[in-house]
């Protein structure tokens, strides 16, 4: 399927969210299409976290006009805004990525199957509510996964999440990143 815009390409990548790494062809197409997109924040916010998110960030950095910044200086542009709800959204994406990566093989397959029901939503605007719903479902599939993640990664990897709280300190019903309609 031909890619007409950067968003088309990103949406194709989104269908692989958490499921697989990018193929060489995907990377090549992504590089080519994204080189035409100038709005880096808009582009970055439309890319769900993937297993190999850092590689995608590096591709973005290589292809978009950020030459005046080092990769490490540019990285926060992709990850955080001053809005606390968007920070939690970002950290939840990283947490979900790590949950899938660290799940036991059978549980990982179950998580990947469960994720299929959310793919249509992941292709559009991802809300904090949706990400929290996915988190709850994944933690039901492998109840000890939170402890597993924290054994491998320090809680400071997800600075806006509160691991002392059952809901990680995320309340989607009041913590919306979108203005009420």
UniProtKB/Swiss-Prot annotation:
State how changing residue 171 to L affects the protein, per the record.
In strain: ATCC 7754
One GO term of the biological process aspect: plasmid partitioning
Which keywords has UniProt assigned to this entry? Plasmid, Plasmid partition
Coiled-coil region(s) at which residues? Answer: none
Keyword Heme assigned: no
The effect annotated for residue 125 to N is:
In strain: ATCC 7754
Q: What is the effect of changing residue 180 to S?
A: In strain: ATCC 7754
**Induction context:** Repressed by the negative regulatory complex REP1-REP2.
Please explain the role this protein plays, according to its UniProt record. Answer: Plays a role in 2-micron plasmid partitioning. Antagonizes transcriptional repression of recombinase FLP by REP1-REP2. Regulates both stability and copy number of the plasmid by blocking the formation of the REP1-REP2 repressor complex.
Instruction: Please report the name of this protein according to its UniProt entry.
Output: Trans-acting factor D
Q: Which gene encodes it?
A: RAF1
């Amino acid at each position: 399927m031909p890619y007409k815009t950067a968003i088309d390409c990103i949406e194709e990548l989104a269908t692989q969210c958490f499921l697989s790494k990018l193929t060489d062809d995907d990377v090549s197409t992504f590089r080519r299409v994204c080189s035409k997109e100038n709005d880096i924040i808009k582009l970055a916010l439309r890319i769900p976290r993937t297993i190999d998110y850092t590689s995608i960030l590096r591709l973005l950095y290589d292809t978009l006009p950020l030459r005046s910044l080092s990769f490490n200086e540019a990285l926060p542009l992709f990850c955080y805004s001053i809005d606390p709800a968007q920070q939690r959204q970002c950290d939840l994406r990283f947490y979900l990525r790590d949950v899938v990566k660290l799940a036991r093989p059978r549980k990982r397959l179950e998580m990947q199957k469960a994720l299929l029901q959310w793919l249509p939503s992941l292709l559009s605007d991802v809300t904090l509510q949706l990400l929290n719903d996915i988190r709850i479902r994944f933690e039901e599939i492998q109840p000890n996964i939170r402890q597993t993640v924290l054994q491998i990664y320090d809680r400071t990897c997800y600075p806006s999440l509160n691991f002392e709280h059952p809901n990680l300190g995320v309340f989607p019903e009041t913590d919306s990143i979108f203005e009420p309609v």
